[in-house]
Amino acid sequence: MPSIRLADLAQQLDAQVHGDGDLVITGIASMHSAEPSQITFLSNSRYQEQLATCNAGAVVLTEADLPFCKSAALVVKNPYLTYARMAQIMDTTPQPAQNIAPGAVISPQATLGENVSIGANAVIESGVVLGDNVVIGAGCFIGKNTHIGAGSRLWANVSVYHEVVIGQNCLIQSGTVIGADGFGYANDRGNWIKIPQLGSVHIGDRVEIGACTTIDRGALDNTIIGNGVIIDNQCQIAHNVVIGDNTAVAGGVIMAGSLKVGRYCMIGGASVINGHMEICDKVTITGMGMVMRPITEPGLYPSGIPLQPNKVWRKTAALVMNIDGINKRLKAIERKIDKE
């Protein structure tokens, strides 16, 4: 990790220095593990008491928490956002070699921009267009006529099928598959007849996709991922799904076909969302949500039964299973009381 003076770091982060600005910062760590040469952050005043035992050389915090800090500090309005920017400055992610590995297989009909990097055993088929500064990791497959915008990076073993469009400055983690066939079949007297998926996948700019996520191509129209969308690991995005700009999708989410999700939504982990319906802008669905109907109003939508001790859960489950009968009995009692 690169070293940097605290004062220089503060200048890049637009932060106020309190304490020794000449302190050399060698890394970022959590509150409980930070050493005197490292910097940490306090994003929630509820954990203010941790400052008393923190050994970090400096802490990123708000003005309100400064009196409780025994070390040097960088004072900012939003410590967590500052931490994100600080991590970018001190990032240790290996940078790719600016070359094309000898083992890469590249079609003569592919078009490569300037400073493109292609790892060993990657396959680039005919008609592919790679913008400037694109990075294709080792073992990737890029299918025919796919376009990848400038500055985008695919880690090792990403598979992108034919005629997919990926925008600029996207980041796609290993094992992800984009543009595989959607789950389309017609039934002929008990036999499943495959429907070729004739659409594609269009991904906007600044999209990040986690490891081992699958985004299927559309049946006729395209599956669309908007600008600024972030998708976690092991998600399944079915054919013809549309995800609006700047929506966040946590790990393990399953979206059924032809679902339309609005902008600025947040989908909690392991949620399952029905297809052929719409979720409006600015909806937050909590983890393990089961969404069976359209959502037309912005807001927070929890689902499911939170964890309980087994004995309590069994009683809760029994009540839920018998809710219809309980409701009928209650209405009968109400009618009896009304008559009296």
Curated annotation (Swiss-Prot):
GO cellular component annotations, sorted alphabetically? membrane
Note the subunit structure: Homotrimer.
Could you identify this protein by its name?
A: UDP-3-O-(3-hydroxymyristoyl)glucosamine N-acyltransferase
Name the keywords, alphabetized: Acyltransferase, Lipid A biosynthesis, Lipid biosynthesis, Lipid metabolism, Repeat, Transferase
Which catalytic reaction applies to this protein?
a UDP-3-O-[(3R)-3-hydroxyacyl]-alpha-D-glucosamine + a (3R)-hydroxyacyl-[ACP] = a UDP-2-N,3-O-bis[(3R)-3-hydroxyacyl]-alpha-D-glucosamine + holo-[ACP] + H(+); UDP-3-O-[(3R)-3-hydroxytetradecanoyl]-alpha-D-glucosamine + (3R)-hydroxytetradecanoyl-[ACP] = UDP-2-N,3-O-bis[(3R)-3-hydroxytetradecanoyl]-alpha-D-glucosamine + holo-[ACP] + H(+)
Q: Which domain of life is it from?
A: Bacteria
Task: Say yes or no: keyword Repeat present.
Answer: yes
Q: Which EC number(s) does the record attach to this protein?
A: 2.3.1.191
Top-level EC class as recorded in UniProt = transferase
Q: Which GO terms describe its molecular function?
A: N-acyltransferase activity; UDP-3-O-(R-3-hydroxymyristoyl)-glucosamine N-acyltransferase activity
- Gene from which this protein is expressed: lpxD
